UniProtKB/Swiss-Prot annotation:
Family according to the record: Belongs to the influenza viruses PB2 family.
Organism lineage string: Viruses, Riboviria, Orthornavirae, Negarnaviricota, Polyploviricotina
Species, as recorded: Influenza A virus (strain A/Duck/Hong Kong/2986.1/2000 H5N1 genotype C)
Protein's name according to its UniProt entry: Polymerase basic protein 2
Quaternary context: Influenza RNA polymerase is composed of three subunits: PB1, PB2 and PA. Interacts (via N-terminus) with PB1 (via C-terminus). Interacts with nucleoprotein NP (via N-terminus).
Record keyword Hydrolase present: no
GO cellular component entries: host cell nucleus; virion component
Length: 759
C-alpha cells in the first residue's frame, strides 16, 4: 500500500508525468528484449543494482544458527524477512566476509587433492619459460585439441561410474566398473578423499576434469599438446606469438606421444613378417605403455594418426573416414568419382597400372606443416590453394597434390625406372612409386607443370617452379594463401575392414590407410614401452635379440626341454627363434643348423651326454633350415656389437657365460636368468623330460587326482601312481619305480610309451 501511495505522489508532480508520457518506450522489440524469458539481459547492470540492496543474497534457514545477527562493527548480517517465494532468508554480503573470516574450517590437506588439476597447472606455469614476443602473420588452423592436461583416458560413461562410486557410494543405481583403469582410479581416489569435507558436487566436477578428455576445435598455430593449449591465449594472437616452454609434462600428452611411437614401430615390424595382420595383433596385445595395456589405450584414446589408426582398424574399432596419402589427411568436401583401372606410360616408357578417379571432387588436405584445398577433375588439377610454415612444407604439399591429381604431365615427368620397395621388399603400388620418385626430386615435375599469369587477389600470391613467391606468375592452378585450411572437425567414426597386408578400407572399398603411409620418423618415447612380443626384440638392436632369446629359453625351460626330446621340429619352428637368425652370418646359417641338429640327435640317442647348458646355448642355431654337411664347429659366430663374436660349442665365452656356482647365465655381460635345475646331474635334463625312474602306465586316470608338474613328481613314494602333465599339455598316468636299476631303459621306452598313451 505504501508503495502505491508513493507512486501516486510521484505522479502528481508534473515532471514525472512528462518524463513517463513523452519518453518513447514504444519500440516493441526493445520492450520484448528486456521483459521476456528468464535469461538475464544485462547481467552487469543487474549485479550492480542487486548489490546496492541491503540483502542481495539468499541463504538456507540454517545459516541463522551459524552466523550472529551482527558483526563486530555492529552491522546487520541477515534480515528476519523471508525471501519472497521461497523459505530462504535474506543475507548481506557482509555475512560472506564474516563466514570467510570466522566460519568453520576443514583440513587444508584435501584442497590440493581435489583441485589437483589447478595446483598442477600453477606448477607448470611457475616453472614454464616465456620467451620473446614476435610480430608476424599467424597461420592458424582449427584442429581438434585436448584442453585439459593431466587427465586419465576414460569415456564419459566410465568416468560417471567412477565419480558416483567415489563421491556418492551409497546412492542407488547400477554401476559397473570393468576396465583396469576404472578400478585403479576408484581405489586410489576413495583412499585419498576419505573424510573430505569439500562439497561433493565440487569434488565430482573436479574428478570429471581429471578423468575425461575434453576436446575443442580451436585455431592453433603451434604445439597442439594440452600443455600448450592451456596457455593458447598467452602464446598466440592474430599477428603475434610468444615463445613458451611448458614447465612440466602431463601424462595424457606422454601417452599420446608414446602410443604413436609404439604403433609406428609395431606396424613397421608387422609389415615384414609372414602374416602382417596376425603379427600386428599379437604385438598390440602384448605391449604395455607406461604400465597400461596398449589395447586399452587404443580403445579409449581418440588420437588420429596413421599407424595408430591401422592398429585400431585391426582391433575392429571404428576410425575416421578421411584417408591418408603422402602424409596428408584428405577429406572429400564435395563431388563424387568412380574408379577405373588405366594403363599409363611414364617419361621412361614404363607402363603403370593406376586406379583413376573419374569425376569432379574437392578435398581439404591437412598435414603437420602445411594445409591445402584441392579441386580436381579426371586426371586434372583444377586448383590448389596451399598454405604452410615455410617453402619446404609448401613444396611437400604441392608434390602430393600433383601426384594425387594423376595428371599426364606428372607421369611424363618421371625420369628413370620406378622400383621402390617397402620394408618387406615388395614393390610399392604405382601411386606410391610416383610419390616417392618426386619426393626425392621434383625439379622436372615443377618445370614441366607449366605456369600462368595471375590476378591480384587479396591474401593470395603465386609460386614459381623454383618455389619462390611471385605476384605476376604461378604454377598452373597453384596459389599460396596466407590463411590455413581447418582440420576436419567432425569426430564421426566409421566401420572399416583391414586385409592381411594391413590395408584399411571403408565399406565402399576405398583404401583409407596402408603401411606406406606410416611415418618413418623415429622419436624417443616419454613413457616406457614394454614389447613382450619376440617380434619386437630387435627394436633395441642385436644385443637385445641375443639376451631376449636366451632369457626366453630359460623362462620356458620346462616346456622347451620336453619338446627338445620329443618334438624338436615343432620347437625349431617357434617364432621366438626368428629374430636370432638375423644375427647369424647368412652363409653359415644352414651349416650351423645342420651341425647342431646332428649333435642334439646324438645326445638323444646316447644317454649321459646330455648337457642342459649346451642345449640352451646351441638351440637358437638349430632353428634355421639345416644343410646336410659333415662340417664340425668348435665355435659359432654371431654378429653383435658391429662385428662377429664367437660362442664356444664347449665352454664359456664373453657372449655366453654360465656360472656353475650361482647357476646364473650372463649373455654379453647381461643377466639372462637362473637355471632352476642342476645341469650337472649327469643325465638329469632329458631323463626328467622323459620321466626317468617312472613307468608310464597309459592315459590319464582321474582317480589319481589332478595332474602334477614334472617338478612335483619327486615327492612320490616308490610304487605310487600319479597323473603328470607333459609336453603340449598332455596328461599321462605314471608309477614311480620300486627299484633304481631299471632307470636306464626308461628313456628309450618312455618316448614310445608317451606317444602310445597320448594317441
Amino acid at each position: 500500500m505504501e508503495r502505491i501511495k508513493e507512486l501516486r505522489d510521484l505522479m502528481s508532480q508534473s515532471r514525472t508525468r512528462e518524463i513517463l508520457t513523452k519518453t518513447t518506450v514504444d519500440h516493441m522489440a526493445i520492450i520484448k528484449k528486456y521483459t521476456s524469458g528468464r535469461q538475464e539481459k544485462n547481467p552487469a547492470l543487474r549485479m550492480k543494482w542487486m548489490m546496492a540492496m541491503k540483502y542481495p543474497i539468499t541463504a538456507d534457514k540454517r545459516i541463522i544458527e551459524m552466523i550472529p545477527e551482527r558483526n563486530e562493527q555492529g552491522q546487520t548480517l541477515w534480515s528476519k524477512t523471508n525471501d519472497a517465494g521461497s523459505d530462504r532468508v535474506m543475507v548481506s554480503p557482509l555475512a560472506v566476509t564474516w563466514w570467510n573470516r570466522n566460519g568453520p574450517t576443514t583440513s587444508a590437506v584435501y584442497y590440493p587433492k581435489v583441485y589437483k588439476t589447478y595446483f598442477e597447472k600453477v606448477e607448470r606455469l611457475k616453472h614454464g619459460t616465456f620467451g620473446p614476443v614476435h610480430f608476424r602473420n599467424q597461420i592458424k588452423i582449427r584442429r581438434r585439441v585436448d584442453i585439459n592436461p593431466g587427465h586419465a583416458d576414460l569415456n564419459a560413461k566410465e568416468a560417471q561410474d567412477v565419480i558416483m562410486e567415489v563421491v556418492f557410494p551409497n546412492e542407488v543405481g547400477a554401476r559397473i566398473l570393468t576396465s583396469e583403469s576404472q578400478l585403479t582410479i576408484t581405489k586410489e581416489k576413495k583412499e585419498e578423499l576419505q573424510d573430505c569435507k569439500i562439497a561433493p558436487l565440487m569434488v565430482a566436477y573436479m574428478l570429471e576434469r581429471e578423468l575425461v578428455r575434453k576436446t575443442r576445435f580451436l585455431p592453433v598455430a603451434g604445439g597442439t599438446s594440452s600443455v600448450y593449449i592451456e596457455v593458447l591465449h598467452l602464446t598466440q594472437g592474430t599477428c603475434w606469438e610468444q615463445m613458451y616452454t611448458p614447465g612440466g609434462e602431463v601424462r595424457n600428452d606422454d601417452v599420446i606421444q608414446s602410443m604413436i611411437i609404439a604403433a609406428r614401430n609395431i606396424v613397421r615390424r608387422a609389415t615384414v613378417s609372414a602374416d602382417p595382420l596376425a603379427s600386428l595383433l599379437e604385438m598390440c596385445h602384448s605391449t604395455q605403455i607406461g604400465g597400461i595395456r596398449m589395447v586399452d589405450i587404443l580403445r579409449q584414446n581418440p588420437t588420429e594418426e596413421q599407424a595408430v589408426d591401422i592398429c585400431k582398424a585391426a582391433m575392429g574399432l571404428r576410425i575416421s573416414s578421411s584417408f591418408s596419402f603422402g602424409g596428408f589427411t584428405f577429406k572429400r568436401t564435395s563431388g563424387t568419382s568412380v574408379k577405373k583401372e588405366e594403363e599409363v606410360l611414364t617419361g621412361n616408357l614404363q607402363t603403370l597400372k593406376i586406379r583413376v578417379h573419374e569425376g569432379y571432387e574437392e578435398f581439404t588436405m591437412v598435414g603437420r606443416r602445411a594445409t591445402a584445398i584441392l579441386r580436381k577433375a579426371t586426371r586434372r588439377l583444377i586448383q590448389l590453394i596451399v598454405s604452410g610454415r615455410d617453402e619446404q612444407s609448401i613444396a611437400e604439399a604441392i608434390i602430393v597434390a600433383m601426384v594425387f591429381s594423376q595428371e599426364d604431365c606428372m607421369i611424363k615427368a618421371v625420369r628413370g625406372d620406378l622400383n621402390f620397395v617397402n620394408r618387406a621388399n615388395q614393390r610399392l603400388n604405382p601411386m606410391h612409386q610416383l610419390l616417392r620418385h618426386f619426393q626425392k626430386d621434383a625439379k622436372v615435375l615443377f618445370q614441366n607443370w607449366g605456369i600462368e599469369p595471375i590476378d591480384n587477389v587479396m591474401g593470395m600470391i603465386g609460386i614459381l617452379p623454383d618455389m619462390t613467391p611471385s605476384t605476376e606468375m604461378s604454377l598452373r592452378g597453384v596459389r599460396v594463401s596466407k590463411m590455413g585450411v581447418d582440420e576436419y572437425s567432425s569426430t564421426e567414426r566409421v566401420v572399416v575392414s583391414i586385409d592381411r597386408f594391413l590395408r584399411v578400407r571403408d565399406q565402399r572399398g576405398n583404401v583409407l590407410l596402408s603401411p606406406e603411409e606410416v611415418s618413418e620418423t623415429q622419436g624417443t618415447e616419454k613413457l616406457a614401452i614394454t614389447y613382450s612380443s619376440s617380434m619386437m626384440w630387435e627394436i633395441n638392436g642385436p644385443e637385445s635379440v641375443l639376451v631376449n632369446t636366451y632369457q626366453w629359453i630359460i623362462r620356458n625351460w620346462e616346456t622347451v626341454k620336453i619338446q627338445w626330446s620329443q618334438d624338436p621340429t615343432m620347437l625349431y619352428n617357434k617364432m621366438e627363434f626368428e629374430p636370432f637368425q638375423s644375427l647369424v652370418p647368412k652363409a653359415a646359417r644352414g651349416q650351423y643348423s645342420g651341425f647342431v641338429r646332428t649333435l642334439f640327435q646324438q645326445m638323444r640317442d646316447v644317454l649321459g651326454t646330455f648337457d642342459t647348458v649346451q642345449i640352451i646355448k646351441l638351440l637358437p642355431f638349430a632353428a634355421a633350415p639345416p644343410e646336410q654337411s659333415r662340417m664340425q664347429f668348435s665355435s659359432l659366430t654371431v654378429n653383435v656389437r658391429g662385428s662377429g663374436m664367437r660362442i664356444l660349442v664347449r665352454g664359456n665365452s664373453p657372449v655366453f657365460n654360465y656360472n656353475k656356482a650361482t647357476k646364473r647365465l650372463t649373455v654379453l655381460g647381461k643377466d639372462a636368468g637362473a637355471l632352476t635345475e642342476d645341469p650337472d646331474e649327469g643325465t638329469a635334463g632329458v631323463e626328467s623330460a622323459v620321466l626317468r625312474g617312472f613307468l608310464i602306465l597309459g592315459k590319464e586316470d582321474k582317480r589319481y587326482g589332478p595332474a602334477l608338474s614334472i617338478n612335483e613328481l619327486s615327492n612320490l613314494a616308490k610304487g605310487e601312481k600319479a597323473n603328470v602333465l607333459i609336453g603340449q599339455g598332455d596328461v599321462v598316468l605314471v608309477m614311480k619305480r620300486k627299484r633304481d636299476s631299471s632307470i636306464l631303459t626308461d628313456s628309450q621306452t618312455a618316448t614310445k610309451r608317451i606317444r602310445m598313451a597320448i594317441n
